Design a protein with these regions (language model features):
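Long, contiguous binding/interaction regions
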Residues: 2-95
Length: 95
């Protein structure tokens, strides 16, 4: 089978419907083994929240995670992953 490379990155979540917060937290909990850091900033005045997640996992699994979050009404998701998991020392050795 094809081995998927583990990568690091972030997932940004904008929840414009705080009534969906429990669903967002449920999905994050289902993928908690990938989440290495989390910050959540609620804005009760506007009825929204922004969540930043640091993640580590293969691109297919991160895609499944962001897809599940993005399917929640009122939730927008963007993500970025490092192109590879090689360290700067490993890259220097290749030169």
């Amino acid at each position: 089978t094809l081995h998927m490379e583990e990568r690091v990155g972030f997932v940004g979540v904008v929840n414009e419907d705080l009534s969906q917060a429990a669903r967002v937290n449920q999905v994050v909990g289902q993928f908690q083994d990938m989440v290495t850091g989390r910050i959540g900033v609620p804005d009760h005045e506007r009825g929204m929240a922004v969540i930043g997640l640091l993640v580590r996992g293969d691109s297919a699994r991160v895609g499944a995670f962001t897809g599940r979050l993005g399917n929640i009404p009122g939730v927008q998701v963007k993500s970025a992953l490092a192109k590879s998991n090689t360290t700067s020392n490993e890259r220097k050795q290749d030169i």
